[in-house]
Design a protein with these regions (language model features):
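Short beta-strand elements of ligand-binding domains
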Residues: 124-127, 150-159, 277-280
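Structural beta-alpha unit
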Residues: 42, 72-123, 216-260, 274
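Glycine-rich, Arg-bearing micro-motifs that act as flexible, cationic patches
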Residues: 10, 104-109, 125-145, 248-271
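Active-site glycine-rich loop that binds ribose-phosphate moieties when present
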Residues: 136-157, 176-185
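Small/aliphatic-rich secondary-structure junction motif
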Residues: 2-66, 162-225
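A structural preference for short, hydrophobic beta-strand core positions in alpha/beta folds
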Residues: 34, 101-104, 156, 197, ...
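Structural alpha-helical scaffold elements that stabilize or flank donor/cofactor-binding regions
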Residues: 115-117, 146, 160, 239, ...
């Protein structure tokens, strides 16, 4: 059975993330899986930094104390994870009528997540993580790395979520975007929503083929042509029409590189007030 993987922690995005994952599960009939990765650092993490400046005897005593502390720390972290999973599960069941399954892992969030994700999953991640929220960062440290490294479609969610009725599909003529167009036409998640097919560039005729294809597939499509900066146009169009979801297929190689590593990603992630769906 295909899955929605909700990557949960105690960030301010958690309730919106749960609602978004539940919406996807309802739209697609997928299993809803809550993924919680315990990536805390043990008490002995910095021991190597001080071992060279203390004597052997005191170091041995410190190791014993740290071992006892780490055991307690591990138990507390596991209790925290169990309570968080239970709370979110109960909330999703009460508000959306969906039973969830759980995956708990320990270690680095990105490493553990990438081992779990499958190509046909849809992963949902909050724009803010626990540490980012504490430091008042606009984007979680793991978000861009997660999108870049995940082998499946990823939705990013902020602190609010409303079930979308319309979405923007930012299109450029490329093999990957053509593949994405076909996936949208077949998608249980997107095909019932109004598609705003947005092209930013100097060749408006590029939209003729995807417009015809999506219309023939039964989608309600609104074509739109813009010129200028990619990120600025996507954000402006979304705000003008109050569209609730931005779907980003892949652009050509140079634009993918710029999107994930450059100013386009930063601008969109920091300024978008609606979820982003990045399709692989």
């Amino acid at each position: 059975m295909k899955r929605v993987i909700a990557c949960i922690d105690s960030s301010p995005c958690i309730n919106a993330l749960a609602d978004a994952a539940a919406w996807i599960a309802k739209q697609t009939g997928r299993e809803l899986v809550l993924l919680q990765v315990l990536d805390y650092y043990p008490a002995s993490y910095h021991l190597g930094e001080i071992s060279g400046v203390i004597g052997f005897e005191s170091n041995a005593m410190l190791l014993k104390e740290l071992a006892e502390l780490e055991q307690k720390q591990s138990e507390i972290a596991l209790d925290y994870s169990n309570n968080l999973l239970q709370h979110i599960s109960e909330r999703i069941l009460a508000e959306h009528g969906i039973q969830t399954t759980h995956i708990q892992e320990k270690g680095d969030f990105l490493e553990q997540s990438f081992q779990i994700l499958q190509p046909d999953d849809i992963a949902v991640i909050g724009l803010l993580g626990e540490r980012s929220a504490e430091k008042n960062k606009p984007i979680g440290t793991n978000v861009e790395n997660f999108i870049r490294g995940a082998n499946c479609t990823v939705m990013t969610v902020g602190e609010q979520f409303k079930p979308p009725t319309r979405f923007i599909f930012a299109y450029e003529y490329s093999p990957t975007c053509i593949k994405m167009m076909k996936r949208i036409a077949e998608s249980d998640l997107l095909r019932l929503l109004q598609c705003h097919l947005l092209y930013i560039g100097d060749h408006a005729e590029i939209l003729n083929e995807p417009l015809q294809y999506l219309n023939q597939a039964g989608l309600d499509v609104v074509p739109q042509y813009r010129y200028g900066d990619v990120a600025e146009n996507i954000l402006t169009y979304q705000q003008e029409l109050r569209i609730q979801l931005i779907v980003l297929g892949a652009f050509s190689h140079s634009k993918i590189h710029q999107f994930f590593l450059g100013s386009i990603a930063t601008t969109i992630f920091r300024n978008s007030k609606v979820p982003l769906l990045v399709a692989k």
